[in-house]
């Protein structure tokens, strides 16, 4: 029959569960997988979480029965003594081997899962084994669980030898007590053995007495019993004896001071919140910052006005008027294990990490204290160095991986994070008026590089060339039209410079109204139209090895239906030589290395002039089309701007109405 003692209160959540309280004994337990056991308490049978209780060995429950049979023959006691002496030595050696590997807690740690141990600075843990890298399994205060290995430091062999010597003293005192029980019931002899062995023997004998065995018959049935549990584990059965009603001896009622402090901290923890920052002035003081949560250890320090506490794994004193106490139920849930999941639903364990602090709503803090409490030992303490070399190392990082607990169906936590989501790309710019035709003026006529493909610069309109155009009221005539031509020379080339094509209006000057519109749409409102008085065109010298060719047919499509503008070059900066030529749609390029057959100088010059005039007229039509298009776009932009202004005004009015409504409330 398996029995267990309740260590934590649990309120039943379903009809088939048991409501258990601390100290109660659950009997007829049937162990099941999944974290839930079935047992009986107060005549009622139901389920309860297994991590809220601690199992009691059968040998411990048989002890009270031994008190009822003191009339056994005396010849059994010597035989029991001989067996006891041999078994005690063997088991003491085994215990020494098992307790050979121990570790001491260097940093405090609060459990994040049910199968983890709560560590406090100074606790001694018996290491069971290394389950996973960074996580060990051990026994602390009778509870077996996992703990991070970088929060502890292993003890040297001296502590192991001390534990073995304590076990030897325990066995010797047990033999003396058994001898006393044979003669007079064991009261006087047990007291003598305690006095002879001192406090160590007293503390070692304490667990067996607490379990209600009695003085005279404490080791009567010892050959049948096992003694595998440590002293710390046996001390945890004190609440059981309170329910049974055994009266403890006066010598066993005074536990060790370190364990008293540990138990008091486990049962009730006090926390305080820092309301004013304080920089440590001595080695034994804590540096606290506003908002920190400090665990109180001792309020009754030697110096009045100073408390002892723990923060980030470091213990020290701090002024009590720099903090305020938190209510007793603060972080109450962190001290008790979580409810295990139902047996059918596995639990995915979360990553082990430091506990998140609970941030309270900030309020107006009281005035900072004017002075610190007086410390009597302040003169004796050395002044603290400016560098924090004497501080304890910070709490190490918790290992990222946690082993699977042996008794639950929980899964191991994922080891890697999902890949990071890529950045959202910037959307391409859209044109609001894509249906309107785009006329490319500078693609073929304003760049000065006529042998380049027109598709590479179809969307670029060079308007800077129009700033250098000076309007003229008279038509310009070429000065070489009446000049005799030399025989054997080719006609003027159609190659133009960027400055020569700056103005589309070469021969016909526009009216003042048209001039003004051209200034607004193409010159970016740079200069007034009245300042344009003349137009100057610079034409480059014709090359000797090239002849005039008709324009490329792609110019018409790129320009929105109009032909590409072309003009000739001449040595004079204030004149131009013009000619006419037919448009050939099958011409593959604007210029080629092959020229036309040689013509008469007069005929070729006249043809070039006519061709240039035709192209100038086409340029003017293109400019007019661009003017109309830009006028339409400007009007559309203005209308959209007006609509946006109206929408903004409506939104502003709605915001004002909402503000007034809120103020009225």
Curated annotation (Swiss-Prot):
Sequence positions bearing Phosphoserine: 156, 159, 183, 230, 436, 509, 511, 521, 587
Regions annotated as coiled coil: 602-664
Disordered: annotated segments: 159-200, 328-444, 467-610
Keyword RNA-binding: no
Biased composition (Low complexity): 177-195, 491-510, 564-582
Any one GO molecular-function label of the UniProt entry: ubiquitin protein ligase binding
UniProt PTM: Monoubiquitinated by CBL and CBLB after EGF stimulation; probably on its C-terminus.
Compartment list: Cytoplasm; Cytoplasm, Cytoskeleton; Cytoplasmic vesicle membrane; Synapse, Synaptosome
Expression sites by tissue: Ubiquitously expressed. Also expressed in some cancer cell lines.
Modified residues annotated as Phosphothreonine in this record: 254
Annotated Basic and acidic residues bias: 355-390, 517-531
Subunit structure: Can self-associate and form homotetramers. Interacts with CD2, F-actin capping protein, PIK3R3, GRB2, EGFR, MET, BLNK, MAP3K4, PDCD6IP, SPRY2, ARHGAP17, ARHGAP27, MAGI2, CRK, BCAR1, SOS1, ASAP1, ARAP3, HIP1R, SYNJ2, INPP5D and STAP1. Interacts with E3 ubiquitin-protein ligases CBL and CBLB, but does not interact with CBLC. Two molecules of SH3KBP1 seem to bind through their respective SH3 1 domain to one molecule of CBLB. The interaction with CBL or CBLB and EGFR is increased upon EGF stimulation. The interaction with CBL is attenuated by PDCD6IP. Interacts (via SH3 domains) with ARAP1. (Microbial infection) Interacts (via SH3 domains) with Chikungunya virus non-structural protein 3 (via C-terminus); this interaction plays a role in initiation of viral replication.
Function: Adapter protein involved in regulating diverse signal transduction pathways. Involved in the regulation of endocytosis and lysosomal degradation of ligand-induced receptor tyrosine kinases, including EGFR and MET/hepatocyte growth factor receptor, through an association with CBL and endophilins. The association with CBL, and thus the receptor internalization, may be inhibited by an interaction with PDCD6IP and/or SPRY2. Involved in regulation of ligand-dependent endocytosis of the IgE receptor. Attenuates phosphatidylinositol 3-kinase activity by interaction with its regulatory subunit.
Annotated protein name in UniProt: SH3 domain-containing kinase-binding protein 1
């Amino acid at each position: 029959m398996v029995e267990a003692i309740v260590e934590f209160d649990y309120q039943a959540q379903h009809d088939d569960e048991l409501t258990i309280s601390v100290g109660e004994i659950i009997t007829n337990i049937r162990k099941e997988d999944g974290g839930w056991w079935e047992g009986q308490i107060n005549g009622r049978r139901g389920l309860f979480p297994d991590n809220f209780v601690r199992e009691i060995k059968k040998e411990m429950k048989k002890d009270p029965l031994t008190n009822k049979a003191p009339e056994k023959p005396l010849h059994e006691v010597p035989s029991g003594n001989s067996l006891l002496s041999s078994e005690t030595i063997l088991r003491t050696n085994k215990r020494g081997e098992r307790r050979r590997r121990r570790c001491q807690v260097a940093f405090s740690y609060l459990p994040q899962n049910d199968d983890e141990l709560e560590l406090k600075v100074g606790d001694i843990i018996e290491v069971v084994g290394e389950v996973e890298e960074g996580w060990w399994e051990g026994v602390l205060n009778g509870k077996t669980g996992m703990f991070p290995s970088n929060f502890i430091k292993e003890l040297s062999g001296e502590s192991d030898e001390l534990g073995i010597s304590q076990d030897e003293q325990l066995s010797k005192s047990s033999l003396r007590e058994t001898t006393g029980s044979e003669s007079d019931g064991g009261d006087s002899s047990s007291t003598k053995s305690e006095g002879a062995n001192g406090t160590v023997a007293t503390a070692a004998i304490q667990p067996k007495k607490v379990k209600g065995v009695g003085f005279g018959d404490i080791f009567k049935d010892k050959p049948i019993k096992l003694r595998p549990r440590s002293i710390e584990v046996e001390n945890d059965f004190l609440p059981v004896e309170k329910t049974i009603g055994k009266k403890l001896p006066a010598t066993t009622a005074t536990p060790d001071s370190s364990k008293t402090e540990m138990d008091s901290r486990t049962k009730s923890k006090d926390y305080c919140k820092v309301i004013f920052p304080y920089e440590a002035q001595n080695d034994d003081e804590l540096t606290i910052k506003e908002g920190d949560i400090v665990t109180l250890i001792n309020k009754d320090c030697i110096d009045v006005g100073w408390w002892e506490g723990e923060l980030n794994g470091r213990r020290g004193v701090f002024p009590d008027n720099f903090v305020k106490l938190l209510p007793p139920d603060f972080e109450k849930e962190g001290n008790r294990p979580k409810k295990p999941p139902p047996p059918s639903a596995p639990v995915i364990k979360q990553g082990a990490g430091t506990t998140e602090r609970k941030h309270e709503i900030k309020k107006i803090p009281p005035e900072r204290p004017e002075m610190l409490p007086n410390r009597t030992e302040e003169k004796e303490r050395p002044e603290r160095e400016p560098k924090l070399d004497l501080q304890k190392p910070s709490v190490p990082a918790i290992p990222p991986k946690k082993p699977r607990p042996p008794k639950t169906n929980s899964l191991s936590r994922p080891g890697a994070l999902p890949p990071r989501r890529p950045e959202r790309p910037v959307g391409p710019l859209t044109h609001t008026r894509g249906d309107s035709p785009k006329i490319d003026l500078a693609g073929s006529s304003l760049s000065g590089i006529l042998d380049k493909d027109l598709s590479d610069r179809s969307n670029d309109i060079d308007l800077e060339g129009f700033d250098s155009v000076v309007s003229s009221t008279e038509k310009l005539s070429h000065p070489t039209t009446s000049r005799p031509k030399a025989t054997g020379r080719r006609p003027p080339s159609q190659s133009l410079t960027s400055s020569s094509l700056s103005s589309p209006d070469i021969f016909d000057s526009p009216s003042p109204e048209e001039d003004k519109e051209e200034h607004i749409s193409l010159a970016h409102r740079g200069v007034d139209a009245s300042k344009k008085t003349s137009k100057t065109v610079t034409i480059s010298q014709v090359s000797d090895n090239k002849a005039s060719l008709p324009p490329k047919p792609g110019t018409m499509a790129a320009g929105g239906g109009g032909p590409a503008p072309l003009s000739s070059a001449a040595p004079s900066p204030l004149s131009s030589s013009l000619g006419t030529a037919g448009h050939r749609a099958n011409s593959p390029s604007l210029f080629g290395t092959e020229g036309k057959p040689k013509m008469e100088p007069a005929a070729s010059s006249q043809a070039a002039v006519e061709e240039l005039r035709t192209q100038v007229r086409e340029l003017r039509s293109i400019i007019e089309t661009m003017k109309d298009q830009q006028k339409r776009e400007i009007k559309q932009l203005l209308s959209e701007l007006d609509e946006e202004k109206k929408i903004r005004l409506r939104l502003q009015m709605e915001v004002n109405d909402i503000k007034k409504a809120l103020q009225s409330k």
